Amino acid sequence: MSNYVVIDLEMCRTGNNYTGEEVGLPNETIQIGAVRLDENLEIAGQFMTYVSPQYGYISDFIHRMTGISGRDIQNAPQMKEALEHFMSWLPSPDIEMISWSYTDRAQIEREMEVKCIRLDGMEELMRGWIDCQEEFSRKLKNRKRFNLTDALVIADIPYVGEAHDGLTDAYNTALLFKKLRLDPDFRINEYYRKSLEPKSPALTFSLGDMLSGMGVAADSAQSCSADRN
């Protein structure tokens, strides 16, 4: 069985003083969270580091959403050093990476390109990337792209921790990935399952239809009365 590592990034927008759009980098990583899975897809290790952005800053919105503050990233490593720490944490070079969507993979690739980061083994790591969001949609036979919180509800997996924390999101993605791979029936939330069942045919007549019918009935009654007379 392959070695799996689930990763999740938290990001901020690039700042006004350093326009990230000018270098093609509208977002920057401010946190990397990851968990390692053993041969039974149980969580066997975890990794977390904050990342100091080169262009961006922690806005009030990002702080409220992620809980990450300027103090958290003040002495944090920049992206190159953070990725070096992450690579050294990996248990072996034979790793399949997992994230909730390809957004995390694309962000790493883009930041490495813009910041001229070169790391041994990173190119190989990118090749075996698994998009858990896509795998989840395929399992449901649904083209919709679900967010992680909704996917966990549908899969009947209690959410652990607070959303938009890199380590927490990686942990919850790992729980969902395990169910996708090890539960052949992939039992889903009963309420969600019932919502997919065909509904009873709706009443389609209108008030006008009803009154029109009443008019026909009245005309028929009058006609019968006239015939009797």
What are these regions (language model features)?
Residues Y50, Y57-S59, H63-T66, G70-I73, ...:
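Active-site-proximal helix-loop-helix substrate-binding element of RNase H-like nuclease domains
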Residues I7, I130, T168:
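Active-site flanking residues adjacent to catalytic metal/cofactor-binding acidic residues
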Residues L175-N229:
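Acidic two-metal-ion nuclease catalytic site recognized across multiple nuclease folds
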Residues S2-E113, G161:
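Conserved non-catalytic scaffold segment of RNase H-like nuclease domains
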Residues I117-K139:
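Histidine/lysine/aspartate-rich catalytic loop segments that bind and position anionic ligands
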